[in-house]
């Protein structure tokens, strides 16, 4: 397996790998990583679909990519997916998956046309004082010290950041900036999270720094992620005769492990209550999605909080069982045990057709929520909320069969141990109606109307004990390599597998690890697209410098006297050169 860039490799079709007709594949879980791996096995590995088996513990595919109408509760979205144009592996996948919405088009075609016709951006990113837009919204408000800390972090080597927290590398200057408000609420970073992952994010998305404040960097699907991404993949794979088995819990994979070789010999499962073992040969490839951020989710309703839990589910127990067999299979406890009580645990879906509530939403987002087009353009964050509450409405309706007069709002609180201004409770203690009341309060609904309007919404809370597990501080070796050294037939896929440079909590990471696993185990002779190399582009770096300093010119940026002298001399030498052109393009001179 090797990395590539450019369209020479992107448009090429690899030859059929030797011996693939004699191979089969077992994929543990039916999340995006597994569905992507199955697709790459068929398209690029040219494996027969009937030789591919997807084993899913639940009765529904999709993993964390959800969006359902629960008959007892109502519409539920545990989260959303922010995408961008340089998710190279994701788009490589979906260019080959037929759209369920547009005839003779791929999912990529559909997505591309949609976001061309209705580009995403926010008209109000942060509010305070019960519905008032933050006066400095749109500015980064980074001090000289904070900017220096960002640069220092990016210049460090990854191995210098083993088990280092964000709070270890950033001071109060940075944590008090608008940049941090945008960053932490958009990505769900918190000060106790991994500085290593923070660095990856900064370097991975530096080309989108200019779109951080207004979300113009982002792209979204038409409907919820289950209907827009998962269902087309499922239908595509079913048409290729891939086998889906639900109600199957994989308890363990027996692996013969040495430093030189790892061979999966059997899969121990419980199928509808019966224990079984699936024997394996080296021709039987196993793809494991280790760990899960939505495992063990509990649900409440309008009148009941979602019950807190810390019980690990099958994906964590499987990873624990694998890690005891081989130290190269990672350290799951690092991610799912002892998450701080302040962490994000709860999100909620509020569904309503109440015109007064919809009007309050429109007052903040400056768009008609029922237009079928972009609404908030990403999350709106309440800066003075103790919960650090945020909410968003993507294009409505979010569900294909949803009534035309209805909207579904996604709400989450970054801090789970703080009491709300309206409810005087933590979000964990709140029923759906109480979460809705807190949201309506911060939107500026008069207090005497809040309770009645909250009753006009059906709000379903979800408690996810491991939702921020990706971000916990880690060191090299805590996550297994996608294909461990010497592995003959076992690979790890998803956001708890280790690959270079890319960032977790993204659809791209799931698809990238799947692609790498398939290409390596089958020896597919085609390059995996490298992570977009924006951090190596001097134009992008100069533009980022301008944005991080809120558009100031070089001669306006606060510098020590000596640095100012050096800057003036360098600018004089750059006059009339290509360097001057670059600085002008970046709005620095």
Swiss-Prot record:
GO biological-process terms attached to the record: fatty acid metabolic process; response to toxic substance
pH sensitivity of activity: Optimum pH is 6.5 with oleate as substrate.
Annotated pathway: Lipid metabolism; fatty acid metabolism
Catalytic temperature dependence: Optimum temperature is 25 degrees Celsius with oleate as substrate. After 120 minutes, the enzyme activity is nearly unchanged at 25 degrees Celsius, but is reduced to only 25% at 35 degrees Celsius.
InterPro entries to which the protein is assigned, alphabetical: FAD/NAD-bd_sf, Oleate_hydratase
MF GO annotations: FAD binding; fatty acid binding; oleate hydratase activity; protein homodimerization activity
Pfam families (UniProt xref): MCRA
Record note on what altering residue 31 to A does: Large decrease in FAD-binding and loss of enzymatic activity
Catalytic activity line of the entry: (R)-10-hydroxyoctadecanoate = (9Z)-octadecenoate + H2O; (9Z)-octadecenoate + H2O = 10-hydroxyoctadecanoate; (9Z)-hexadecenoate + H2O = 10-hydroxyhexadecanoate; (6Z,9Z,12Z)-octadecatrienoate + H2O = (10S)-hydroxy-(6Z,12Z)-octadecadienoate
Keywords: Detoxification, FAD, Fatty acid metabolism, Flavoprotein, Lipid metabolism, Lyase
Paired cysteines (S-S): none
EC code(s) of this entry: 4.2.1.53
Function description: Catalyzes the hydration of oleate at its cis-9-double bond to yield 10-hydroxyoctadecanoate, probably in the (R) configuration. Cannot catalyze the reverse reaction. Is not active with saturated fatty acids and trans-, cis-5-, cis-6-, cis-8-, cis-11-, cis-13-, cis-14-, and cis-15-double bond unsaturated fatty acids as substrate; is only active on cis-9- and/or cis-12-double bond of unsaturated fatty acids without any trans-configurations, producing 10-hydroxy and, to a lesser extent, 10,13-dihydroxy fatty acids.
Protein name as it appears in the record: Oleate hydratase
Organism in which the protein naturally occurs: Macrococcus caseolyticus (strain JCSC5402)
């Amino acid at each position: 397996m090797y990395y590539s860039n450019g369209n020479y490799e992107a448009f090429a079709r690899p030859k059929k790998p030797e011996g693939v007709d004699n191979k089969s594949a077992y994929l543990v879980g039916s999340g995006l990583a597994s569905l992507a791996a199955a697709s790459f096995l068929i398209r690029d590995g040219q494996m027969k679909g009937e030789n591919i088996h997807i084993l899913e513990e639940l009765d529904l595919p999709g993993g964390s990519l959800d969006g359902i109408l629960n008959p007892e509760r109502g519409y539920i979205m545990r989260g959303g997916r922010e995408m961008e144009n340089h998710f190279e592996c994701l788009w490589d996948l979906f260019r080959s998956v037929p759209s369920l919405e547009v005839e003779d088009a791929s999912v990529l075609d559909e997505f591309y046309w949609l976001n061309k016709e209705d580009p995403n951006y926010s008209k109000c990113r942060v509010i305070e004082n019960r519905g008032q837009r933050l006066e400095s919204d749109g500015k980064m408000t980074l001090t000289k010290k904070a900017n220096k800390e960002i640069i220092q972090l990016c210049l460090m080597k990854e191995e210098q950041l083993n088990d280092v927290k964000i709070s270890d590398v950033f001071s109060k200057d940075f944590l008090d900036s608008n940049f941090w408000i945008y960053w932490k609420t958009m990505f769900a970073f918190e000060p106790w999270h991994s500085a290593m992952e923070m660095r990856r994010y900064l370097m991975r998305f530096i080309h989108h720094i200019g779109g951080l404040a207004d979300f113009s960097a982002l792209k979204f699907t038409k409907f919820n992620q289950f209907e827009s991404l998962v269902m087309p993949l499922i239908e595509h794979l079913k048409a290729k005769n891939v086998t889906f088995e639900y109600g199957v819990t994989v308890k363990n994979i027996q692996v013969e492990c040495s430093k030189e070789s790892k061979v999966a010999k059997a899969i121990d499962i419980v199928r509808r209550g019966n224990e079984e073992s699936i024997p394996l040969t080296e021709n039987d490839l196993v793809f494991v999605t280790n760990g899960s951020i939505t495992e063990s989710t509990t649900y409440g309703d309008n009148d009941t909080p979602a019950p807190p839990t810390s019980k690990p589910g099958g994906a964590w127990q499987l990873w624990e069982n694998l890690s005891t067999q081989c130290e190269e299979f990672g350290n799951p406890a690092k991610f799912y045990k002892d998450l701080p009580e302040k962490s994000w645990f709860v999100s909620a879906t509020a569904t309503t057709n109440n015109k007064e509530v919809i009007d309050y939403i429109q007052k903040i987002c400056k768009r008609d929520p029922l237009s079928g087009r972009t609404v908030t353009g990403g999350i709106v964050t309440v800066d003075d909320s103790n919960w650090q509450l945020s909410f968003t409405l993507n294009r409505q309706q979010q569900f294909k069969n949803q009534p035309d007069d209805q909207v579904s709002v996604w709400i989450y609180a970054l801090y789970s141990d703080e009491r709300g201004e309206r409810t005087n409770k933590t979000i964990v203690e709140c029923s759906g109606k109480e979460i809705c009341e807190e949201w309506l309060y911060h939107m500026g609904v008069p207090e005497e109307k809040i309770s009645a309007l909250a009753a006009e919404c059906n709000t379903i809370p979800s408690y996810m004990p491991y939702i921020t597990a990706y971000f916990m501080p880690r060191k090299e070796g805590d996550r297994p390599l996608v294909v461990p050294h010497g592995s003959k037939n076992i690979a790890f896929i998803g956001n708890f597998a280790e690959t270079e440079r890319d960032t977790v909590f993204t659809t791209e990471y799931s698809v990238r690890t799947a692609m790498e696993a398939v290409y390596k185990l089958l020896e597919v002779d085609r390059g995996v697209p490298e992570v977009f190399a924006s951090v190596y582009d001097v134009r992008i770096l100069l533009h980022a410098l301008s944005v991080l300093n809120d558009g100031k010119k070089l001669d306006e940026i606060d510098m020590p006297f000596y640095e100012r002298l050096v800057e003036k001399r360098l600018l004089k030498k750059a006059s009339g050169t290509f360097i001057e052109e670059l600085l002008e393009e970046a709005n620095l001179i």
